[in-house]
Amino acid sequence: MTTLNSTPRADGFHMPAEWAPQTQVWMVWPERPDNWRLGGKPAQAAHVAIAKAIARFEPVTVAVSAAQYDNARARLDMPNIRVVEMSSNDAWVRDSGPTFVINDRGELRGVNWEFNAWGGFDGGLYAPWNLDSQVGSKVLEIERCPRYATQGFVLEGGSIHVDGEGTLITTEECLLNRNRNPHLTREQIEAVLSDYLAVDKIIWLPDGLFNDETDGHVDNFCCYIRPGEVLLAWTDDPEDPNYPRCHAALSILENTRDAQGRAFIVHKMPIPGPLFATEEECAGVDQVHGSQERNPSVRLAGSYVNFLIVNGGIIAPSFDDPMDEKAREILQKLFPEHEVVMAPGRELLLGGGNIHCLTQQQPAPFKA
């Protein structure tokens, strides 16, 4: 694998929007018993459902440990799903995996960020994370894809959304957190994002969703649906702790323009719940020092915004919640050219994330 000493912007590469054509989606098999209950078996069943839903639209590659390879291969019994052996600490490939960039000559490259399990030893969710920190480079190695190294810059893919036309949305809660890149100022962080993703304007929302243990990833709160239009998690309940977060984000979005000078159209997505884990669900998680504790009194950061756009499809989470059907209707209205598939999201939420967090799209390069 070639490691490049330049930057994507300098070489004419950029991160495309999620709705751009894709060649495949990457996933990593869940099995960590101190994060996934009952040794990961319920989460694996949800993983299979999601992988098969995606595979209806495009190929899927699932990275699996040697110990779980036979089990995963047997369950992922579709021709469009490839299973490869890869060591990892957990399954969050949106955050541990690479960010792919393309140019207008049909070339694909990858950006390899530093991963510290959402905070390292200052609020991180587990240790060690050394295997996860290798996932990005291993994915690029498998794809024979040249790699940009970011010299220790900590970033998770779930903390950013781009429109492919020069604008990036993120949250201060995450990117300015002291446990990510405390040695860098906001301006220095913006410069890195500009160089490695080729964005010209960065929109900073104050916070993500309440109790999001990633420190407020934007992909669980606000996402692009097309250039100039975003979908924002929303509540009208003043007693909901998400209420001030939603309104603060809306104020920012309504009073700014994107890199192309467009005012934002903001669509609202109701927040499910409030959702909580049961005592039985929490009891099924191994208790290990240094790993995130699961507690039935702590509200879960459930969100329908945590969906994945694939070629011709939208794969979105359902929570056995009365709001599920409303969420599906909203997504179908916003994406009339796509088929909306609701997939089981509760087991993923119990582990700390959802469909977008557990997937990483690989764009299809094209010649202009």
Curated annotation (Swiss-Prot):
Q: Which reaction does it catalyse?
A: agmatine + H2O = N-carbamoylputrescine + NH4(+)
Q: Name one GO biological process term.
A: putrescine biosynthetic process from arginine
Q: What is its EC number?
A: 3.5.3.12
Q: Does the keyword Secreted apply?
A: no
A Pfam family annotated for this chain is PAD_porph
Broad enzyme group? hydrolase
Q: Keywords assigned by UniProt?
A: Hydrolase, Polyamine biosynthesis
The pathway it acts in is: Amine and polyamine biosynthesis; putrescine biosynthesis via agmatine pathway; N-carbamoylputrescine from agmatine: step 1/1
Annotated active site residues, numbered on this chain, are: C357 (amidino-cysteine intermediate)
InterPro entries per the UniProt record, alphabetical: Agmatine_deiminase (IPR017754), Peptidyl-Arg-deiminase_porph (IPR007466)
Q: Which GO terms describe its molecular function?
A: agmatine deiminase activity; protein-arginine deiminase activity
* Protein origin, superkingdom: Bacteria
HAMAP family, sorted? Agmatine_deimin
Tell me, what does this protein do in biology? Mediates the hydrolysis of agmatine into N-carbamoylputrescine in the arginine decarboxylase (ADC) pathway of putrescine biosynthesis, a basic polyamine.
Complex formation? Homodimer.
Family, similarity comment = Belongs to the agmatine deiminase family.
- Under which name does UniProt file this protein? Agmatine deiminase
Encoding gene (name): aguA
